[in-house]
Design a protein with these regions (language model features):
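Acidic (Asp/Glu) and glycine-rich low-complexity loops/linkers
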Residues: 22-49, 54-146, 153-158, 162-164
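Bacterial N-terminal signal peptides
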Residues: 7-18
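Positively charged n-region of N-terminal signal peptides that target proteins for export
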Residues: 1-7
């Protein structure tokens, strides 16, 4: 009888600690943010691509390009989405910022490449992760930004801007 009570107490304690730990883990996951900072000179170009979520480009200071991104979701897996920043072009002077969903091979100045994964990628019914990207751009940097399912806002640009959105 005593071992039954001890076992029941152990099970109850384990369940209680699991219930208490779950909100803390979920809260930590919801802060899935990304930060990157690097140099970009006037006359070079920023390329930003997002499939599901907004892109906001703002005037920055100095010669630093600052990228922040935050993942939002209800039922999807945020680990299936990663933010990638690459420096390309002459002397690696241009910068490409992409949100890559599982099942995509790559992204460059021209956008996304590779096959989509209908079961697990953004297109599937299992992943509702959206990415909110904010980029601070120095004066004189050309901007090319596109989102499939989200807004593209550019404020304070002092060079050429190409902004596209399919549904946003």
């Amino acid at each position: 009888m005593r071992s039954l009570i001890v076992a029941a107490t152990l099970v109850a304690t384990t369940l209680a600690s699991a219930i208490v730990a779950t909100p803390a883990r979920a809260q930590q996951n919801e802060d899935n943010s990304f930060k990157w900072s690097g140099d970009i000179q006037s006359g070079h170009r920023l390329y930003a691509h997002n499939l599901n979520g907004s892109i906001k480009v703002e005037a920055g200071t100095g010669s630093k390009l600052d990228v922040t991104a935050r993942k939002h979701w209800r039922r999807g897996n945020p680990e299936d989405v990663k933010i990638v920043v690459t420096q390309v072009g002459t002397n690696k002077g241009d910068v490409v910022v992409c949100a890559l969903w599982k099942g995509q091979n790559s992204c460059d100045e021209d956008g996304y490449h590779g096959r989509k994964d209908n079961d697990n990628g953004w297109w599937g019914d299992k992943n509702d992760v959206s990415i909110e990207i904010t980029i601070k751009v120095p004066a004189g940097v050309n901007i090319e930004a596109s989102s499939v399912n989200g807004s593209v806002d550019v404020d304070g640009a002092t060079a050429e801007v190409i902004a596209k959105s399919v549904n946003g």
